Amino acid sequence: KSLIYKNKNTSLDKNKYINDFKKFNLELNHFTKIIIYKTIEENGIKLSVLSTELACFFKNYIDDDEYVDSLVEVLGELADNSLSHGESDCLIDINIETVYNRKNPSPNKYISLDIVIVNFDKKLLGDRIKDKFFNNDFKGSPKTEKLLNTALENHKSKFSESYTFDDFCNCASFQWRVSSRQSSSDSFAGTGLTTLIDGLINKSESVYCYVYSGNKIINFINGMVSLDENRFIGFNKENDFLNKIPDKSSITRSNYNLNGVLYNLNFIVKK
């Protein structure tokens, strides 16, 4: 059984979870790395080391350098979110397998990228965005603040048990140049997560991706993750975050509560 399943319906014990992962055997198609926040903080180890390791690993399987660069940027951004935003440890686990299309056999080989990123944070995915709303703390980001306030004004009349303010903040964390860092400016925030949507999901043959935090899940569904003129993602068929709430298939619930944030990213791509 998976480590997530074994810890269902309870708080994850970070040390036990990490120790369990240390028991796993690494193979050529399997990459596992645990990044300890305290080590980064004390020794100043840079995430460029992680980026180099990931690039070397992916290039053994994927010929498309641009796609590899996008993967590395996304995973580096998500790891950085865990370390600098949440001040918490981060676990990255990647498995690569060759797959075939039974309905349409072809000489082209495809691979399945199964990526799990977990950070062990007391704060959930959208909590820091929510804090920014409550504290009016979008300093240096007037355009972003205006767009998000417009979206909130249009969404709040549609809030319900299945789509709450917390869900709105979760979705907001993926928008272009939106950051959960304190006092971030428009210039540098949120670019990696937008690349996740624009550069990976829409360029893959098949996709199954979601982010899971608390008991809330955002599903990244083809056709609902395109960027609008503001480079925002609607999570709906209209591709309109400012005026329309996400599609009901994009926002779902789990029966179990996860303390932290888990990204499950599955891509089918040409080898």
What are these regions (language model features)?
Residues 42, 59-70, 161, 184-188, ...:
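Conserved aromatic-histidine-acidic binding/catalytic patches
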Residues 46, 63-74, 165, 169, ...:
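Short amphipathic alpha-helical segments
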Residues 56, 60, 84, 179:
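Conserved helix-loop functional segments at active or binding sites
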Residues 65-103, 193-202:
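Conserved ATP-binding N-box helix of the HATPase_c
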Residues 76-77, 113-119, 210-212, 263-264:
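Extended hydrophobic secondary-structure segments that form protein cores and membrane-embedded regions
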Residues 82-135, 153-154, 246-252:
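ATP-lid-like helix-loop hinge signature
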Residues 126-271:
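Flexible, glycine-/charge-rich segments associated with ATP-binding catalytic modules
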